[in-house]
């Protein structure tokens, strides 16, 4: 049975001066998919990600977010304040650079989205600690970011992206700064924490090995989608959650109540 769309983009156009970074792009992303967006530098792949994630507004077109637990809404036309609220309440983000606050501990960083939603600090940090443990960081909750390896810090960033139970996670080159072994480990953690829990992952990557572990690959060239096909995801394990992550997912249940 085909899952329902969580993001529907239609006719997206984005210009930077004379350059059409996106040229009439349409794309439907369904619940539980892991979608790798690939393309050369300047192809428009990051601009597409940013438009889908309400980071920037396209010049024209439509983006409808209709994820589970989220009231379906048109994202194009929202002001910056409203886009920020959508990002904070309904979306998760993982970047190439983890963008963690060095003065905070791992658990304090991971708990930040919950604090922004108004959860009390003890409850927020308890939920965050559960995700850190599920991602292999048990016992490291009180370490500052400078005391973690690159792969460990990126796992903290994944916990931060997932701690609110966001139904859609966007990742921009999440393994780009890591060596091949650490990259594979972090990608496994990211897939299990998102699609392994029935959530949706949209990821920009230049790495074909990373893309092949997703369920779908979208190729962008000169601002247009030139290919869109299922990837060979036999090695991803994305469809089966680990027991620890299944337990961690329950930590996010009811946070909005």
Predicted features, each with a name:
Residues 144-148, 152-154:
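Conserved ABC ATPase signature
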Residues 38-40:
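The feature captures the beta-strand-to-loop junction immediately N-terminal to the Walker
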Residues 169-172:
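Catalytic Walker B motif of ABC-type/P-loop ATPase nucleotide-binding domains
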Residues 53:
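Helix-to-loop junction immediately C-terminal to a conserved catalytic motif
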Residues 163-167:
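A short, proline-enriched helix->beta-strand linker immediately N-terminal to the Walker B motif
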Residues 62-85:
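ABC ATPase NBD Q-loop/coupling interface
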Residues 137, 141, 161-162:
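ABC ATPase C-loop
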Residues 104-112:
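Short coil-to-helix segment of the ABC ATPase nucleotide-binding domain corresponding to the Q-loop/switch region
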């Amino acid at each position: 049975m085909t899952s329902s769309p969580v993001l529907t983009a239609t006719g997206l156009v984005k210009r930077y001066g004379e350059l059409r970074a996106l040229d009439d792009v349409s794309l439907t992303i369904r619940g539980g998919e892991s979608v790798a967006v690939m393309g050369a530098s300047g192809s428009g792949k990051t601009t597409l990600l940013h438009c889908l994630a309400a980071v920037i507004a396209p010049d024209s077109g439509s983006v409808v977010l209709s994820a589970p637990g989220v009231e379906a809404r048109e994202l194009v036309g929202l002001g910056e304040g409203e886009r920020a609220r959508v990002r904070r309440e309904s979306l998760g983000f993982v970047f190439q650079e983890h963008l963690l606050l060095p003065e905070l501990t791992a658990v304090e960083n991971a708990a930040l989205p919950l604090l922004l939603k108004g959860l009390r600090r003890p409850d927020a940090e308890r939920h965050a600690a559960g995700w850190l443990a599920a991602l292999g960081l048990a016992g490291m909750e009180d370490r500052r970011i400078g005391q973690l390896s690159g792969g460990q810090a990126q796992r903290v960033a994944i916990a931060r992206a997932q701690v609110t139970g966001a139904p859609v996670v966007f990742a921009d080159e999440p393994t780009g700064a890591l060596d091949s072994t650490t990259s594979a480990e972090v990608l496994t953690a990211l897939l299990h924490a998102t699609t392994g829990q029935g959530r949706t992952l949209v990821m920009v990557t230049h790495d074909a090995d990373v893309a092949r572990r997703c369920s779908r690959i979208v190729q962008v060239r000169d601002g247009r989608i030139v290919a869109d096909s299922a990837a060979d995801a036999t090695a991803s394990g994305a469809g089966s959650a680990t027991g620890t992550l299944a337990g961690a997912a329950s930590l996010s249940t009811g946070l909005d109540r």
